[in-house]
């Protein structure tokens, strides 16, 4: 028997398949939710900034692997009182950048190489080299029209003043002042009265010794009259050695004849990336502030490597007094170029390498050197009384005097 719809047989009647309609509804809801989610995700992705490629490290930020093993020295006693703006220039003239600074042969006066109220002397008619008495008064000056970029200096036992003029005029500067074409890339010897006595290098022309020099950073005259010159300045900004990369020390006779050259660009022993300053201890050892490599390298006077020290930081200026106290001034350190280290003046022993004191950076709205915080000098000198002088480059300019409050 065939039972019709609605019959009372125990066999269930056939009904419409309602679960299909419910499943379709649920699918529609799910698809709608997926569409809304996709739309929202699209909005978020559209609003999100595009991912930027990782920034390249700054030029010259690399360093020797050994440096990373040294714990930064930033927290030591500071036994010095800081006196900013030491020295008053004549005629109301303002200080410019100063990195060349040295005590006079008398141990009382200080010579400073002012970059003519700016950061170069091109076109200037003032004397860049000034002699300061203990009160900061200028008692002598010279060098007008002769020195373009005083960078490092020394005073020999006869009182002669040696100046490293580290760069030549730029094309833009020469367009205005063509008469400066033959200045720079030289080491100049002046008498105590400021008369030019000797020139090493060819003015305005970088190159190789003996005829030429490339960006001489500093000059040092040994007790026997031998002359040491450190080249070159821009090497600290290089991470790879270009064909013309320069990092060298040259030794010259007292009359200016080349004796020998040692060193090369690089990160290894007896290699340099910007040998920025020179000093000599009582034993006649030559200390080289290898700034780009964040270290001191120590040599005998024939160029034999004796030791390497990292504990004095990324040094711009270096001086050693008669007691073998070493003064190392750092104007550059920051998280890129010397991670973990602060700018400042570190004082210690040239005999043992121990660092005793740390004078922190000046407060400054703008940093010196490569960045970071604060400002500190680039050149350093010490007088016979133990007063220390910093030559300032950057937002803080002129000369700073550090007066010892305690005796060692």
Where are these regions (language model features)?
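Short terminal hydrophobic/aromatic SLiMs and anchors at protein ends
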Residues: 2, 8-9, 15
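Low-complexity, intrinsically disordered or signal/transmembrane-proximal segments
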Residues: 3, 17, 51-52
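Residue-identity detector for glycine
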Residues: 4-7, 22, 42
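Bacterial N-terminal signal peptides
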Residues: 30-44
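Sequence-structural signature of mature extracellular/luminal beta-sheet repeat domains
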Residues: 47-408
């Amino acid at each position: 028997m065939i039972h019709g719809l609605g019959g009372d047989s125990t066999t269930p009647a056939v009904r419409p398949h309602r679960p299909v309609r419910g499943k379709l509804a649920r699918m529609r809801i799910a698809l709608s939710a997926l569409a809304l989610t996709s739309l929202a995700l699209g909005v978020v992705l559209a609003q999100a900034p595009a991912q930027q490629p990782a920034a390249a490290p700054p030029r010259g930020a690399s360093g020797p692997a050994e440096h990373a093993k040294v714990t930064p020295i930033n927290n030591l006693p500071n036994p010095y009182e800081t006196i900013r703006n030491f020295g008053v220039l004549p005629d109301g003239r303002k200080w410019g950048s100063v990195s060349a600074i040295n005590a006079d042969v008398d141990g009382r006066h200080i010579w400073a190489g002012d970059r003519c109220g700016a950061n170069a002397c091109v076109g200037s008619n003032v004397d860049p080299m000034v002699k300061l008495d203990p009160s900061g008064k200028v008692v002598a000056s010279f060098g007008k029209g002769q020195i373009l970029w005083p960078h490092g200096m020394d005073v020999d036992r006869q009182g002669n003043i040696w100046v490293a003029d580290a760069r030549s005029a730029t094309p833009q500067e020469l367009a205005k002042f063509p008469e400066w074409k033959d200045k720079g890339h030289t080491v100049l010897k002046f008498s105590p009265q400021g008369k030019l006595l000797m020139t090493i290098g060819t003015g305005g022309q970088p190159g190789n010794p003996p005829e030429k020099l490339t960006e001489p950073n500093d000059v040092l005259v040994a007790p026997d009259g031998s002359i040491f010159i450190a080249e070159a300045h821009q090497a600290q900004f290089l991470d790879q050695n270009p064909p013309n990369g320069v990092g060298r020390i040259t030794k010259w006779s007292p009359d200016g004849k080349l004796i020998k050259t040692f060193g090369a660009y690089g990160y290894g022993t007896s290699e340099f990336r910007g040998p920025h300053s020179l000093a000599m201890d009582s034993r006649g050892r030559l200390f080289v502030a290898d700034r780009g490599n964040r270290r001191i390298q120590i040599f005998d006077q024939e160029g034999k490597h004796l030791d390497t020290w990292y504990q004095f930081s990324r040094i711009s200026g270096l001086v050693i007094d008669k007691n073998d106290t070493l003064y190392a001034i750092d104007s550059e350190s920051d998280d890129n170029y010397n991670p973990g280290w602060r700018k400042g003046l570190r004082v210690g022993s040239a005999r043992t390498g121990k660092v005793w004191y740390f004078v922190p950076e000046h407060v400054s709205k703008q940093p010196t050197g490569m960045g970071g915080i604060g400002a500190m000098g680039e050149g350093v000198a010490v007088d016979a009384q133990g007063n220390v002088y910093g030559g300032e480059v950057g937002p803080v300019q002129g000369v700073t005097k550090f007066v010892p409050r305690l005796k060692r």
